[in-house]
Structure formats: C-alpha cells, structure tokens
Amino acid sequence: MKNSVGISIATIVAIIAAIYYVPWYEHFERKSPGAGEMRDRIESMFLESWRDYSKHGWGYDVYGPIEHTSHNMPRGNQPLGWIIVDSVDTLMLMYNSSTLYKSEFEAEIQRSEHWINDVLDFDIDAEVNVFETTIRMLGGLLSAYHLSDVLEVGNKTVYLNKAIDLGDRLALAFLSTQTGIPYSSINLHSGQAVKNHADGGASSTAEFTTLQMEFKYLAYLTGNRTYWELVERVYEPLYKNNDLLNTYDGLVPIYTFPDTGKFGASTIRFGSRGDSFYEYLLKQYLLTHETLYYDLYRKSMEGMKKHLLAQSKPSSLWYIGEREQGLHGQLSPKMDHLVCFMGGLLASGSTEGLSIHEARRRPFFSLSLERKSDWDLAKGITDTCYQMYKQSSSGLAPEIVVFNDGNIKQDGWWRSSVGDFFVKPLDRHNLQRPETVESIMFMYHLSHDHKYREWGAEIATSFFENTCVDCNDPKLRRFTSLSDCITLPTKKSNNMESFWLAETLKYLYILFLDEFDLTKVVFNTEAHPFPVLDEEILKSQSLTTGWSL
C-alpha cells in the first residue's frame, strides 16, 4: 500500500523507526537537554531494562542482564516479587506523565498486577529478611495501592489485599522477643523468627528501625492498630537501655541485641546498618505529624554535626565520617555511597517539603538556626556526592570512598582527579545506586536551582554510557551493574539490582518533572511514595505515639 506521493507504508515505518531508535545514544551527548527530553530518555532507559527482564527473567527475583540468568531468592524457588513489586509504582509514575510510551506503561502495569494477583503467593516455607521484604515488597505494594488510587490506573484492591497478607506474616517477627525488637529473618509460612546467623545474633540497628513507615501506613489503611503498636515498641528499649540521647548524643552503633535492646557493636556510621535509622525518625514525623520523632531526629543531627562531620582536602568537601571505635575513637574519613541520601534528608527536614523560598517566610524555619544549618549542610553533602561522580574517571561513583583528610596512607588506592578522595581496590564497584540522584532530586524541587538538573543529566548520561549492554541496538539494549567503575573501559557485572528500576530511575525521572509537591508525599527508604496521613483520621483511629522518654 502507498500514499498519494508514492512512498510505501513500509518506507514510512522504516523512517519512523530510524528516528525513534538511532538518536537515543547521540542525544546523550547533547548538553543541557530540556526536562521533557530528559523524561523521554529516562523512560526509554527504564523500558529497555524492563523489556529485557520481561523477556528473559519475568517473575524471578534476581536477574543478570548480560547472560540473561535468573533465580528466586527463597529456598524452594518460590518468587517474592522482588523486581516486579519493587518496580510497579515506577511504571505508574511514568505512565502518568509519559507522552511517548503511555500505552506500553499501562499494559505493563496490567501485566504486573495480574502476576501479583494470580501468581505471587507469600505463603513461602523459607526465611526472608524482615527489613528488605518490608521496604521493598510491603512498601512497593502500599505505594502501588496509593498510586493506583490517585492516578486511577489498575485495581488498587489487588495491592492492598496482598499487602495485608504480607504484613500479617511479617508482623509475627515482632513477637519473637520481650523487647519487641524483631530477629533479622522470619519464615513466611510458619511465622518462626530467626536470629541473625552472624554477629552473635545481633540485629542491624537500621533494619529494625526502618519498618515503621510501612506498618503505620498499613494501620492507617486498615484501621488495625496492632501494626502501629508493634513497630513502635522497638524504640523504648533502644533509647532507654542505652541512654541513647545522653551517652551517644542520638547516634547509634550499627548492631543491637534483640533480646536485651543493648548495643552489640561500637561502630557508628551513617552508611550500611546505620543509615535509615536516622531517615525514619524524620520521615515518621513527616508522614504522621508525631513531633517526638522530629525531636529525636533533631538530637541525632546535632550529634552527627558534632562527632562525624569533616571536610576534605583540597576542596573542603563536607563528608560524614565513621567512628569505628565509638564516639571517643578516631574519626575515619571513609564514607559509603549510601550516605549520599543525607543531602535530601537534611533538606526535606529543614523545609518540611516546602521550597526554601517559602520556608524562609515561615517561623518554623526563620527562627531556627538548626534548620538553616541543615539546609546549608544539605547543599554541601549533595555537592560532595556529586563530586564523587564528577571526579571519577567514568563519571560514576564507586561504592565506598575514603576522603583525603591529610593523614591517609593510600598505598595502591586510586586517587580522584582533584584529590579529594581515594578508592580502595575492593570498593570500585557501582551497583547503580540511587542515593545521590535522590538528594539531587530533593535539592532541585526544594530550591529550583537548575544546576541540580544539570548534575542529574550528567549522571544519567554516565549510567547510559557505562552500564549499557548492546548499547548500539535499542532492541537489545539493557543496563547492568559494574564490578569496576574506575578503570576505563568500565567492567560490567551480571546483575541488575531491583533498585535500579525502583529508585534510581524513579528519582531521576521525578527530578525532571515540572511539578512535584514534596509536602504531600513521603518516600520510604526504597523510594516508594506514601501520602502524608490525615491528622483527623489518625486521631479518629487512635493512631498516636505510644511511648515517651
């Protein structure tokens, strides 16, 4: 069939295909792209990863994009929904704003929803990690329920019913000890809680204090106060049995014995096993308006500034170090990439989701030296984390850096281009983590400073150029982790973490949305957005803080 000027339909299709496919790689070479163009690019990156997973690993929890390998996490090979459940709210957010791929996003939402409803079964006779399953699976289901409702896409009941089933199974973990601090794992079929197999049975402090948002939101949706009460029980023994506010200035060692509530280690850090303890203090306040949690957060932030904060040489980059021997030990200049969430956390705590221009007109900000200090530090930490990308040979940050404090012996370590940090040989990997782009997103929407979009575009470009597989063929292109982001060319690893889809690409996408009201939503630690809860409904359900100091 031909049109009136004699060009065949096949030719037209070929021309459109060429326009559609060829320019994506070239587009990433451009500078200062518009917000709409960046959204299109990020949608394309997401869908290229998603299509590849759907074709070669659908339904499996773990996926290797290079070799198209897949497997499930629990013993017995039953799926937890690790990738699908973690990603469905990203599908929804992109569906809502997409101009190029709206119908494809809608179809994939429906496909995921059917799989969750018809295939996913949490009656699994195997141990799962309580923390990871809560933040990814329970959080993902609750966020999908929320977005399905407000965006009017899919069947919200599917997500809530599945969340209740999983929440009931996970809640049994809190009944395993007299303190209410759960063991690290639980058998989803039997309800048997299992201690950590290492570290003398101690639980990660961040893990059992990063369950509260999910269970409080579930309590709010169902009216079941038990969820709320169970997750609040962990705090009283933690604070009182350790004299946390006085002896530790609000800072927590990274392990806690669940049977006693006493700390089981000396190391204090804002990286792994410490990070989200601080995050959920603030976010419980933002989600539920409970002022106790802001007061605890405030104490922790002042403790961090007193004991952990330092600046690098030669550029005076602010970083949050570690105290490996407790508060009276030497400050280590080591910082995990995980710590880079702190820029966004400090900023959102400072303004409570308002733009900085609006917050400065409000007494809660204008009369608070601490909030002003938080805002300045948020800018500093976000800049530091951007420099971890900028000063890297690939434009991507490694998993861990050691900042130059003038005293470091760096034999065999890689030195950044300016010299502000070093990277040890075993810390060169890049898992496509979200924390830096998370903070960049918050800083942009709270300040409207365009430089943050420029930084985000640079990082997206570096991900595209360095983590893609079959880069020049859009039909086969997908993205994977790196075992080495320092040596050029970078070395790829056969694994795609679910947070690439659930967090990193989501935060990059939101960065380029024209409007995003951060006073209306609170993200859990896996980037699943929950709505700020209505105070009158909370009051009517008697959902209030159940402990005090």
Curated annotation (Swiss-Prot):
Encoding gene (name): MNS1
Catalytic activity as recorded in UniProt: N(4)-(alpha-D-Man-(1->2)-alpha-D-Man-(1->2)-alpha-D-Man-(1->3)-[alpha-D-Man-(1->2)-alpha-D-Man-(1->3)-[alpha-D-Man-(1->2)-alpha-D-Man-(1->6)]-alpha-D-Man-(1->6)]-beta-D-Man-(1->4)-beta-D-GlcNAc-(1->4)-beta-D-GlcNAc)-L-asparaginyl-[protein] (N-glucan mannose isomer 9A1,2,3B1,2,3) + 4 H2O = N(4)-(alpha-D-Man-(1->3)-[alpha-D-Man-(1->3)-[alpha-D-Man-(1->6)]-alpha-D-Man-(1->6)]-beta-D-Man-(1->4)-beta-D-GlcNAc-(1->4)-beta-D-GlcNAc)-L-asparaginyl-[protein] (N-glucan mannose isomer 5A1,2) + 4 beta-D-mannose; N(4)-(alpha-D-Man-(1->2)-alpha-D-Man-(1->2)-alpha-D-Man-(1->3)-[alpha-D-Man-(1->3)-[alpha-D-Man-(1->2)-alpha-D-Man-(1->6)]-alpha-D-Man-(1->6)]-beta-D-Man-(1->4)-beta-D-GlcNAc-(1->4)-beta-D-GlcNAc)-L-asparaginyl-[protein] (N-glucan mannose isomer 8A1,2,3B1,3) + 3 H2O = N(4)-(alpha-D-Man-(1->3)-[alpha-D-Man-(1->3)-[alpha-D-Man-(1->6)]-alpha-D-Man-(1->6)]-beta-D-Man-(1->4)-beta-D-GlcNAc-(1->4)-beta-D-GlcNAc)-L-asparaginyl-[protein] (N-glucan mannose isomer 5A1,2) + 3 beta-D-mannose
Active site: 399
One of the protein's GO biological processes: protein glycosylation
Record topology, Cytoplasmic segments: 1-4
Protein name per UniProt: Endoplasmic reticulum mannosyl-oligosaccharide 1,2-alpha-mannosidase
Gene disruption: observed consequences: No visible phenotype.
Residue positions the entry lists as glycosylated: 96, 155, 224
E.C. numbers: 3.2.1.113
Subunit structure: Homodimer.
Lineage, opening ranks: Eukaryota, Fungi, Dikarya, Ascomycota, Saccharomycotina
Function: Involved in glycoprotein quality control as it is important for the targeting of misfolded glycoproteins for degradation. It primarily trims a single alpha-1,2-linked mannose residue from Man(9)GlcNAc(2) to produce Man(8)GlcNAc(2), but at high enzyme concentrations it further trims the carbohydrates to Man(5)GlcNAc(2).
Domain of life: Eukaryota
Positions with a binding annotation for Ca(2+): 525
GO terms assigned for molecular function: calcium ion binding; mannosyl-oligosaccharide 1,2-alpha-mannosidase activity
Gene3D superfamilies cross-referenced by the UniProt entry: 1.50.10.10
Cystine residue pairs: 340-385, 468-471
Reported cofactor(s): Ca(2+)
More about this protein: Present with 8260 molecules/cell in log phase SD medium.
Keyword field: Calcium, Disulfide bond, Endoplasmic reticulum, Glycoprotein, Glycosidase, Hydrolase, Membrane, Metal-binding, Signal-anchor, Transmembrane, Transmembrane helix
InterPro entries named among the record's database cross-references: 6hp_glycosidase-like_sf, Glyco_hydro_47, Glycosyl_Hydrolase_47, Seven-hairpin_glycosidases
Chain ranges passing through the membrane: 5-24
Bilayer disposition of the protein: Single-pass type II membrane protein
Organism: Saccharomyces cerevisiae (strain ATCC 204508 / S288c) (Baker's yeast)
Pathway the protein takes part in: Protein modification; protein glycosylation
GO cellular component labels: endoplasmic reticulum; endoplasmic reticulum membrane; membrane
Similarity-based family: Belongs to the glycosyl hydrolase 47 family.
Residues on Lumenal side: 25-354
